[in-house]
Amino acid sequence: MSDANLLEASVRTEFGKGAARRTRRAGNVPAVLYGHQSEPQHLSLNAQAFAAILREHGTNAVLNLDIEGKKQLALTKSVVVHPIRRYIEHADLLIVKRGEKVTADVAVTVTGDAAPGTLVTQEATTISIEAEALNLPEAIEVSVEDAEIGTQITAGSIALPQGVTLASDPELLVVNVIAAPAAEPAPGEEAAEAEGESAE
């Protein structure tokens, strides 16, 4: 995770839904910066620049904030996206220091093809991990290559990158490999079978 994600921010002095709407209309994202026992700071981020960083580095992106000339590293903790129009409505940012370990939820990506006749179900899309803020992985890969029916992959059995430890319950079921349901015959096939039986 790079710390080169420079993002300019300005301090917001207006609060409430009306102020947040005005911030978004101006092309910005209302955000709150908190952590390290400091008072929460209400910020305004450039929407396009922030969205570009999230697209490249994921929802746990570390930001190098320039708050009106003052530099501050921050971890993106949560992002609220409008369910229909898909713009960013709000963001929560956590103050971090170099070398500091943080806990974050990261996406689990399933790769590979399980054995024939199986169906892979992903029971958990994220797991919670602990790592240095600047070294948080964007995602954790889990391979199901040639996995047989009955294979279960728990959070505790996932190989994590060096320097990353599991914060989730080790027994959390992440991937389950089950038997694929039998294909139902098409209506035409059923009719043909019935006709064949009648002819006999």
UniProtKB/Swiss-Prot annotation:
It comes from the Bacteria. Signal peptide: none annotated. GO terms for biological process: translation. GO terms for cellular component: cytosolic large ribosomal subunit. InterPro entries: Rbsml_bL25/Gln-tRNA_synth_N, Ribosomal_bL25/Gln-tRNA_synth, Ribosomal_bL25_b-dom, Ribosomal_bL25_C, Ribosomal_bL25_long, Ribosomal_L25_dom, Ribosomal_uL5_bac-type. Keywords: Ribonucleoprotein, Ribosomal protein, RNA-binding, rRNA-binding. One of its GO terms (molecular function) is structural constituent of ribosome. It holds the Pfam family Ribosomal_L25p. CDD domains: Ribosomal_L25_TL5_CTC. Belongs to the bacterial ribosomal protein bL25 family. CTC subfamily. PANTHER family: RIBOSOMAL PROTEIN L25/GLN-TRNA SYNTHETASE, ANTI-CODON-BINDING DOMAIN-CONTAINING PROTEIN (PTHR33284), RIBOSOMAL PROTEIN L25_GLN-TRNA SYNTHETASE, ANTI-CODON-BINDING DOMAIN-CONTAINING PROTEIN (PTHR33284:SF1). NCBIfam families: bL25_bact_ctc, PRK05618.2-1. This is one of the proteins that binds to the 5S RNA in the ribosome where it forms part of the central protuberance. Part of the 50S ribosomal subunit; part of the 5S rRNA/L5/L18/L25 subcomplex. Contacts the 5S rRNA. Binds to the 5S rRNA independently of L5 and L18. This is Large ribosomal subunit protein bL25. It comes from Nocardia farcinica (strain IFM 10152).
